């Protein structure tokens, strides 16, 4: 950081927004961080003004929900991911955020994770959650790339969240490939306040998260070659 650009910081805008429930899980009605000043021009706005169709997939963290600085107001045509940087630490959330200008959306909305909300965010019940955000975000990014025909230039920002604070992912072949790969595993006891759940295979989880991200990147590059 050179000192010549805006730093978002992590000032939160949650405490006075009230509550909303998803299943038995309580969330703030408004989530997110301090918004960018609208006079501070950001890259997607420049690209949009120059004729590009724009997409962003992953973490936003450039302004809380409903603020002056959300993807729909800052040059993004298609967005899917986390508006809030804190929530982006977690991989089986109660909701994600979405905006699709082409579909007629007028603002960023919440998309409820129906396969998650009937289970607690912390504890053994958490293992029953099925909607894994990293996979969903990548899937939406690939759908967006598929729609690019070459008639209009496109600009994508892929702010994927792997790996991050929470060590959690599907128990699939990617995770299983690292079983027993480390001479000494590490146990993480969890943090109820942050909803980071316990794991006995911290090294295995982290390594698999990096591999999962690498697979995503490979798929993106292959799709770009097609285009």
Residue ranges of each PLM-predicted region?
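Short alpha-helical functional segments enriched in proximate histidine and acidic residues
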Residues: 50, 54, 144, 216-223
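Extended hydrophobic/aromatic segments used for targeting, binding, or gating
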Residues: 173-216
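Conserved amphipathic alpha-helical interaction elements at protein-protein interfaces in regulatory
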Residues: 6, 147, 223-226
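Metal-dependent active-site segment of extracytoplasmic phospho-/sulfohydrolases and closely related
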Residues: 154, 159-160, 212-227
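N-terminal cofactor/phosphate-binding cores enriched in small/glycine residues
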Residues: 1-3
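Formylglycine-dependent
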Residues: 8-52, 60-154, 159-169, 193-207
